[in-house]
Amino acid sequence: MNTLPNKITLCRIVLNPVFLILAYQGLLLPAFVVYIIACLSDMADGYIARKYNQISNFGKFMDPLADKMLVLSAMCFFIESGQMPGWAVAIVLFREFAVSGLRLIAVEQNRVIAAAWSGKIKTAATMIALGAMMLLPSVKFINIIAVAAIVITTVYSGIEYFVVNKDVFTEAK
């Protein structure tokens, strides 16, 4: 746990409440800066872990959890501010729980379902879309495009996880 990538992941988790406090205080530019730092730290911890062979079980679990915490916190803020419809967040939550359930079934079979490229694209698209919504909150067109990008990449990646790993269900007992 004392690796640099794990420390970066922990910092991202700590940045989450800082982001929320700033956003809910109406300090959107500072909240945006914290959000961008958190997003960039997501890229940094993964890069460092791979480059210096510091991949850990802690990082495999906490890194995606930190991403979900940040993204879902931003989405909750956008629901409350009227920038994002609740149904879009419900789709994201459904996909996250469904893929997590799929991974749990796979673990029972001593299998690991690695992150798919579509999942990485979904995370990047979501982080960029939410950042755009934060930076330009009054531009409705940006909100519409951002929500569409989030929903489309979320649904696509969720379907791909289940199609590629459908054999998990045939082996389930």
Located regions from the model:
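N-terminal membrane topogenic signal
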Residues: 1-11
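Helix-loop junctions at the membrane-solvent interface of multi-pass transporters
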Residues: 21-25, 80, 105-106, 132-136, ...
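Membrane-embedded alpha-helical segments that form the functional core of polytopic membrane enzymes
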Residues: 15-58, 74-94, 140-155
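Membrane-helix boundary/interface segments in integral membrane proteins
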Residues: 95-111
